[in-house]
């Protein structure tokens, strides 16, 4: 069985979360609740959810070294339940990686951009430049997270835009 850990990021920094007992369905349910609850992911107190899978055979996040590529392979969102980005990163043993912005549907106009902003505790809000199709609500993001957690599924390639980060 696959195990998962989360980081919840807010104004006061990241908080690690490791549910026990757990299975992929329970983790997906818990993450869905966080993504869809306006009182939880509000874009200020809490503005990001990161989920990563523990390596096969590992049953607790404390057993995964900080340097493990597993900790740098994840799905994340940033923003609020009303407007968020969804990103996926795949990190390899040699440290190389691919990082993608996820879209709800294929990009209609590659020259069209919008901004998702949240309060990360700095004097100025954090802004992320996205195509309009890359802006999700929590309800729209939940199935993407669920597929990633329950089946290890990535969205189709036409919905992934590689980022240079």
Kindly give the residue locations of the regions a language model identified.
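Short secondary-structure capping micro-motifs at structural edges
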Residues: 36, 58-65, 69-76
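Acidic, proline/glycine-rich low-complexity IDRs
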Residues: 1-56, 78-165
